[in-house]
């Protein structure tokens, strides 16, 4: 046997560039019979290594490289598992090293795990004799061919392998530079470290002692460990009174079924079927474990989602409280979740509110033990964009060049360097000089290597034994992790449950808590009506900002066209709005509004597709069609659905014949059977799990219900979840204002870090103020809670510590209106800052010296700041306007000019706006144009100014002013935009309107008498304007006479009316 006993794979992170598949490929080409994986301190690569070796008839040997110390000296050591007990010892030894961040292993620790291992000390010198002698009674201790001779110790040839060929030596230098954040030595980076995969010819040229080579085979023969997959490693659930899990589960299910007011016989029949499948598969403990942790969450104030994935198709899950979706009511299939004809572990993923997810994980750790619960490792890789920058950095490329590299590689998921090389600009960069070609060569060699570890976002492993008995562990940022990925851990047989954090559940929970506290209303989301017409009106208007699954522009557009009337409409929309099935949306909407257009390929499809108007939307429908037509069991139907989605030609052909034959036996003609099969094949890729759609649509409906009935609370909590994002905050503030909600400035006696809902509106978060950090807010709020509300500005200044009470903080709070409630103008408070900063207001507050030593604070009353300045400061410190937006305020004053808002404007009507953003670009023809963002004080809208108009108005756009724009509304990427045709300043527009108006319409005649002399019965010259009165009570217009525009009193006449009572046409 020829073997390599010291292979370092790429999972020896940033120490080796040798991919597992390349090591095995080389072994095959060189007729190597066995390979030992010996990464330093870790066992990350074991499963992939084992699979690759077995697939290529290579004997896998499991090992690890460690550094053993006696406290004075350290020796590199390779340990190999002789058997499966030795493999378990490797798991535990690696776990000890990684969990405790050990750089070196004491010989005492190694001795604990050495009985079933082969130990090979490397490069042993005189200084290492003491370490080697410790293991003199260990029969399988060796020294490598470079070690000194020690009596009684055998030598073995062992070659360290870290890269493929001599030409790949530069990868080790590059990886070391990336790891250590240093620069690559371009002169010595190709130095051969003698750590490549030696060919048979190269080995023969080394003149190795034959006895050393013989020992290689001896060691390889001794190693017979193997990974065991699909073990039954489910933990056992502790039942009361040691009752069997099966009996306990049945008793709980029947008890719960009797509590529910359901059709007992129908539900009992389904329950018996599911229970039989679950227990026959041996999964009763699984359901009890999941039920227990969800019960803990719900009884400890942690909101849990209604369900996720296919688990909502299980009645057992519903009765155990794992889901809140009745699978019979919603026509969900158990086999989509757990297929009796395809035995796999159930996969129940659970959504918890994201702010309290850790509480449930902590419960599981306490219940099962710290070493029995862990997260799961994931790996970050040196993908194209990452490796390009990393290698560029270590080669000393400047930031400009690094940015050029980033810009040349497309932002495409999974893009490779080979794909980027097909782009002419990237190819030109590579061949610009020899240095760039060298860079590209190194990048290509490193591309795809694992770079670092991180934690899987949701997966938690649970066992009733210490996990290191089945898999090695490591330490992550938040606790223990398996060293193997999610699929590898599951394949071993370990129980994995996804604990997902869902922000929307946190929002719902906060709303419910605040409504109960403030209004005394206890909202039970399981009892709200799911046919609330106000909810469907909201959805039909597309007012779904902030609503789970429904807030994208595309979905809002679909909702407006569909006009949902039932919960099923929401389920359909969330399932259809995805790549693929989106093309069926127009058909679905048309048929939904006109059911007469629904057509079925065969009448027996109608019961299955009636609710979706003849469109196949759900995976469950595919299974039902296979069952109805071909007499498939639902288990067989699920296998058919999976085969269709994987597009395996051979399997599909077999399933096609199976389907047609079954349909024939069921009485269907072969032609219709083929058509039905092709129909479901077409939709197999598109089909969405209905159970998941129902579960997530329930969350969407609940949020819609809360938005309709408790809007202040809804928006306050949505806003609290976007603190820190000025753009999202401004968007949500704008949306709330459009819904008629009053946005109140931060209030020093009411506001917190989060937004606070009230009957009057929503108090802004103090945390939204630029320059006011979380710790400052915490000090202010804590002081308020402990010692009561602040009485005035001076009281606030006296009670807040100096370290917080800076001029910057005080100015920010004043200028956004946080002290407005004290009845002093903002300018007055700004004047008072010097007093509170110059005087020592932190003298012993409760002592009698305070009144004596503290000078009397007096306000020097000042007139309020101009409105424009107030608005300017609010925008500066908050990113948006709290007081009336300048455009909105001006609109009220100038509405007599017959101007419009963005929301109600039509093509080419004058709209009053402010330009929030102007982005100038150059067209392919070299002409300038611009994309702009318009703001009317309530709404923002994108606009485009094409070259001809841009040339005309470019100078005007440089002014910070209010403008009247007009143009044509259009849609771009499903978003409404304005193609701007004309731009004027408001002042110019007003001047022209007053000069050239053709008609004046009033709806209040109370001012007429004052200007009786101006009004003439007939038109006498070209400057005369028609004066009309519109009577709103009878909806009728009458002519009152004419007024001359040149009359000196003309402007006085116009201004005498309330702007809402007069219009110039």
Swiss-Prot record:
Cited PANTHER family: DNA POLYMERASE III SUBUNIT ALPHA
Cellular component GO terms held in the UniProt record: cytoplasm
Protein family per UniProt: Belongs to the DNA polymerase type-C family. DnaE subfamily.
Subcellular location(s) of the protein: Cytoplasm
Name of this chain's protein: DNA polymerase III subunit alpha
One GO-annotated biological process of the protein: DNA replication
Main EC class the enzyme belongs to: transferase
Major site of localization recorded for this protein: cytoplasm
Subunit relationships: DNA polymerase III contains a core (composed of alpha, epsilon and theta chains) that associates with a tau subunit. This core dimerizes to form the PolIII' complex. PolIII' associates with the gamma complex (composed of gamma, delta, delta', psi and chi chains) and with the beta chain to form the complete DNA polymerase III complex.
Record-listed E.C. numbers: 2.7.7.7
Catalytic activity: DNA(n) + a 2'-deoxyribonucleoside 5'-triphosphate = DNA(n+1) + diphosphate
Highest taxon of the lineage: Bacteria
Keywords per UniProt: Cytoplasm, DNA replication, DNA-directed DNA polymerase, Nucleotidyltransferase, Transferase
Keyword Transferase appears in the UniProt entry: yes
Any one GO MF annotation of this record: nucleic acid binding
Function description: DNA polymerase III is a complex, multichain enzyme responsible for most of the replicative synthesis in bacteria. This DNA polymerase also exhibits 3' to 5' exonuclease activity. The alpha chain is the DNA polymerase.
Disulfide linkage: none
